[in-house]
């Protein structure tokens, strides 16, 4: 059980980074509104430089706080993990655009786990000792948290859709 909770702690910067981006309502799109040959936007209006900066700031800050408690250097990992999470989220948006889904359209599993994939790649590349049970635990927890937090964000008018 302690191992599962430690696995969750490892993912906190990514969770915070992913959860903070929706607070930015508008900004400069990362894709600069460019379209690919299929006529669709690369990422869409939902991925902005301002949202990315806020996500990196919050995720890095949480990494710094974690480093105080774990006694290890998590500031850098917090930053890079947050970046990995946001790149995973952008990959999810890219895939959604390629299959014809617009911003806000449902894409079960992809919507919930794209950022976890990016964070996991970073954590593994930094030799963080994750096991399959920790990753599965975090994925299941993230799916449940995603449904709950998105509904709350929708009710608070932070998001335009409840998913």
From Swiss-Prot:
GO terms (BP aspect): glycerophospholipid biosynthetic process
GO annotation, cellular component aspect: plasma membrane
The protein's annotated pathway: Membrane lipid metabolism; glycerophospholipid metabolism
Transmembrane segments: 4-24, 52-72, 75-95, 107-127, 128-148
UniProt-listed InterPro entries: CarS, CarS_archaea
Superkingdom: Archaea
GO molecular function: CDP-2,3-bis-(O-geranylgeranyl)-sn-glycerol synthase activity
Alphabetically ordered keywords of this record: Cell membrane, Lipid biosynthesis, Lipid metabolism, Magnesium, Membrane, Phospholipid biosynthesis, Phospholipid metabolism, Transferase, Transmembrane, Transmembrane helix
EC number: 2.7.7.67
Record keyword Membrane present: yes
Compartment(s) where it occurs, according to its Swiss-Prot or TrEMBL record: Cell membrane
Pfam annotation, one family: CarS-like
Cofactors, names only: Mg(2+)
Reaction catalysed by this enzyme: 2,3-bis-O-(geranylgeranyl)-sn-glycerol 1-phosphate + CTP + H(+) = CDP-2,3-bis-O-(geranylgeranyl)-sn-glycerol + diphosphate
Primary enzyme class: transferase
Topology relative to the membrane: Multi-pass membrane protein
HAMAP family, sorted: CDP_archaeol_synth
PANTHER family linked to this entry: CDP-ARCHAEOL SYNTHASE (PTHR39650:SF1)
Function field: Catalyzes the formation of CDP-2,3-bis-(O-geranylgeranyl)-sn-glycerol (CDP-archaeol) from 2,3-bis-(O-geranylgeranyl)-sn-glycerol 1-phosphate (DGGGP) and CTP. This reaction is the third ether-bond-formation step in the biosynthesis of archaeal membrane lipids.
Family in the record: Belongs to the CDP-archaeol synthase family.
Name used for this protein in its record: CDP-archaeol synthase
Organism: Sulfolobus acidocaldarius (strain ATCC 33909 / DSM 639 / JCM 8929 / NBRC 15157 / NCIMB 11770)
Lineage, opening ranks: Archaea, Thermoproteota, Thermoprotei, Sulfolobales, Sulfolobaceae
Annotated gene: carS
